[in-house]
Amino acid sequence: MKQDGTPLKLDSFKGKVVLIVNTASKCGFTPQYADLEALYAKYREHGFEILDIPCNQFGGQSPESDAETTQFCQLNYGTTFAQMKKADVNGANELPLYTWLKSQRCFNGFDEGNSLAPVLDKLLRDADPDYDKNADIKWNFTKFLVDRDGHVVERFEPTADMKLVEQKIEELL
């Protein structure tokens, strides 16, 4: 859903490479907004789009209104890509888009090269010892890469190296 309350038609992305990401403004991964904006600026003319879906399900790290979130991102990271209304990505009220995305690409662990991976693993394992056995979104800034034909080709956890994300985007463009 767009911030103005109108439905987003996914067919408007037909023929484009799309990175779908659940975000938060008060998260340790929030600085990834700078990387996302750099990717968007570099590749948007080549048919690349970012679909930013703020979410408050992980540590309450997106507490502000939709308008405040957009203002924060634009002022602090210069974001120019589309930001949707805040939404759930897990559970009874999750967006149908996320039900589909998770059915296409499940969780395959955190990038062990990232210093935050063991922190996230402990946090999640303490809450649910079997957290890694389902496809649910584990934290903010989980990304799904969709090709021009609408196929989900990759799932990147928030700990993934953004250089790898860029490499996969380039392969699809």
Please annotate each region the language model reported.
Residues 11, 16-18, 25-55, 73-77:
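Conserved helix-turn-beta segment immediately C-terminal to the redox Cys motif
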Residues 22, 46-65, 80-91:
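Thiol-based oxidoreductase modules, predominantly thioredoxin-like and allied folds used
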Residues 153-173:
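Non-catalytic, surface beta->alpha helical segment in thiol-disulfide oxidoreductase systems
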Residues 28, 58-61, 91-93, 152-154, ...:
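Short catalytic/ligand-binding loop motif for oxyanion handling, primarily in non-cytosolic enzymes
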Residues 31-34, 63-64, 95-96, 167:
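Generic recognition of short, well-ordered alpha-helical segments
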Residues 72-74, 78-159:
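Thiol/selenol-based redox catalytic cores and closely related redox-interacting motifs
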Residues 1-11:
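N-terminal "domain-start" segment that seeds a small globular fold
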